[in-house]
Structures are given as C-alpha cells and as structure tokens.
Amino acid sequence: MIATQLENGTIKTFKSIPKDWGNVVGGFNTLSGSDLETYGFYDVVTPVIKESQKLGAIEWSEQYSVFLYPVENKEFSQSLAEMKAQKIEKLKIIYGQEIAKTDWIIIRDQELGNTTDSDVLTARATLRTNCATKETAINGKTTKAHVADYSLPSFI
C-alpha cells in the first residue's frame, strides 16, 4: 500500500499506485520509488497486531519517512469472566466439531455391538484432554488482553 498527504493535511491511501497524478498523465504508476517520493508518495507500514490491539489512524513518520498505523490497545466492554466464558464456548465448539467426525463410528459400533477401534477411542480421549487443558489455560488468564490474544486451535 502507498499513501500521500494532501494539501489539506489529510492522508490518502492507495492499494496500488495511481496511473495518473497531478501533471503526470499516464505512467505515474511506473515511476521509481524515489520519483514517487518527490510527489509525496511513500510506503505504508501496517504492523502485525494481536486480537487485543487495533490500528490507530494512519500518520506520517518523519523519523522513518513512511506512513504508518500506530498500534493501540482495544477496550473491551465485556468483563474478564464474560470474555473467558465466550472463549471457552468457542473452544468447545471447535473440539466438539472435531470429535463429531468420529461420532458415526461410535454409533455404528454401538448399534452393531462391535468393539470400537482403540485408535478412535484414544483420539477422542486426546481431544477431550486437550480441550480441558486449553480451558484451564483460558481460565488462568488474568487480563482481558491475554484472553483475547489466546489462540484457539484450528483442525482445518
């Protein structure tokens, strides 16, 4: 992404360099980086943020000669307990969906009176144990930011 500061002080961002700008009609997007800088176009730095953070309003960094988004901490309206409960609910849904993939095996074996393969039973037990471990970890978080930043597993 690239941006420029307009005469009125506002910063305009572009996903790609415009083809025309000012007195350059066509080919503006082919100018070199240093040529673009003469027109006030500089790179935009977008930092990687955590769930507990958000990007602030884009600003010019004189020090680095780039436009950047400052990182700000999010304010959470839920209580710590509510955030934990919500995160745990999502966790259980994720693990429930993974366990559900083998439910048909359990049901089939029960209906037919077969013994379920130990690999299936072990895998299901491991999922339940892992879910309980992660639930304990979530409950151990002491700040809203730590709960928000706790990454849930993905089985995709």
Spans of features found by a protein language model:
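A preference for well-ordered globular domain cores
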Residues: 1-156
